[in-house]
Amino acid sequence: MDIEKAPHSFRRSFNLAMLTVAILGANALAMAQESSQLKLRDILGKGARQLSADEVQQLLPEAKVMSVGARGVTRRWRNNADGKFVASGYDPTTTTPRMQNFQGQGSWHIGDNGKYCVMLEWPRTTEQWCRILFKLDDKYYAVKSADDENAVVHELEIRH
């Protein structure tokens, strides 16, 4: 059937149906991504342990850090001893080639109770957070609160 030759009311209904399918598909994907995110209880159940403030102090200076977000955005930096760093990022979801690769200036410090604190000034936004670090096998995870077992954890690759 040639949609261009169909009556206007049919084309409008068809377009609305296609839009509805697209919205429902996007919502289902977003819900699946959210429900598939690791929670603190998941890693604790596998034996993860919270790093002490001393362990964090030994781990972070001069460490190379990489994180991959839920949408596949990759960010990398190296924690310089002076508390500053230059970060680079790659966003595979953008359709603007010049925005796929980006850089930002940042700083880091170890906060209260050994929390890893980062401030990043990206070209379009500023990101600031403090996270508690956990270790499971050879992987590190960052979480906002160790008291909330439903808190989403973010895997960080930390190496020297």
Regions found by a protein language model. Give the residues of each.
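Lipid interaction determinants
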Residues: D2-H8, A26-S107, N113-H160
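Bacterial N-terminal signal peptides
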Residues: N15-A26
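N-terminal secretory signal peptides and thylakoid transit peptides that target proteins
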Residues: H8-L16
